């Protein structure tokens, strides 16, 4: 299965596509980030995210896309900006005819690190280890996107095994 993870951010929106082979080994297909300039108007930032995510989806053909659930931020303005980015990311996914799976941040960290309150550096290190990457993914948004994809792969594999036993 090939899964794209997206980590929505107002400065960087990370993306990563991870594939699980028939032996459940994980492989990083592509990873990167859409860098957004603080000087650009919001509508230009959102258009850039939309275009670049659509391009990655069309080029690498994931079967499903996973995104983190909305979390509650202390700063309402920041939460609103992230909501815009998340909405545009979901629109890009829908435009490409794919479905979106969502996961709570605690679930992502638990699936990748084994601890729901893991630090960013722990997530980055574990993502690099699980994907056999030569270095830790940077910026952290890229590692987070890969972690979201890994979370979906682990979760769907567990659900498949559970249904097979039933």
From Swiss-Prot:
Its EC number is 3.1.21.10. It is an enzyme of class 3 (hydrolase). Pfam families: RuvC. PROSITE patterns: RUVC (PS01321). One of its GO terms (cellular component) is Holliday junction resolvase complex. GO terms for biological process: DNA recombination; DNA repair. Binds 2 Mg(2+) ion per subunit. Mg(2+) 1 binds at residues 7, 141. It is found in: Cytoplasm. Keywords: Cytoplasm, DNA damage, DNA recombination, DNA repair, DNA-binding, Endonuclease, Hydrolase, Magnesium, Metal-binding, Nuclease. SUPFAM superfamilies: Ribonuclease H-like (SSF53098). The keyword Nucleotide-binding does not apply. The keyword Magnesium applies. Transmembrane segments: none annotated. Mg(2+) 2 binds at residue 68. One of its GO terms (molecular function) is magnesium ion binding. Its cofactor is Mg(2+). Homodimer which binds Holliday junction (HJ) DNA. The HJ becomes 2-fold symmetrical on binding to RuvC with unstacked arms; it has a different conformation from HJ DNA in complex with RuvA. In the full resolvosome a probable DNA-RuvA(4)-RuvB(12)-RuvC(2) complex forms which resolves the HJ. Belongs to the RuvC family. This is Crossover junction endodeoxyribonuclease RuvC. It comes from Koribacter versatilis (strain Ellin345).
């Amino acid at each position: 299965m090939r899964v794209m993870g997206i980590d929505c951010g107002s400065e960087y929106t990370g993306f990563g596509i991870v594939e699980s082979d028939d032996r459940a080994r994980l492989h990083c297909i592509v990873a990167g980030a859409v860098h957004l300039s603080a000087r650009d108007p919001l509508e230009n930032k959102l258009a850039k995210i939309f275009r670049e995510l659509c391009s990655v989806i069309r080029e690498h053909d994931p079967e499903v896309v996973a995104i983190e659930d909305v979390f509650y931020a202390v700063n309402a303005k920041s939460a609103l900006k992230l909501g815009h980015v998340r909405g545009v990311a979901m629109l890009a996914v829908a435009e490409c005819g794919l479905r979106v799976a969502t996961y709570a941040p605690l679930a992502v960290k638990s699936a990748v690190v084994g601890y729901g309150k893991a630090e960013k550096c722990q997530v980055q290190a574990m993502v690099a280890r699980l994907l056999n990457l030569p270095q830790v993914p940077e910026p952290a948004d890229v590692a987070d996107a890969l972690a979201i994809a890994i979370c979906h792969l682990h979760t769907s594999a567990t659900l498949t095994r559970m249904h097979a036993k039933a």
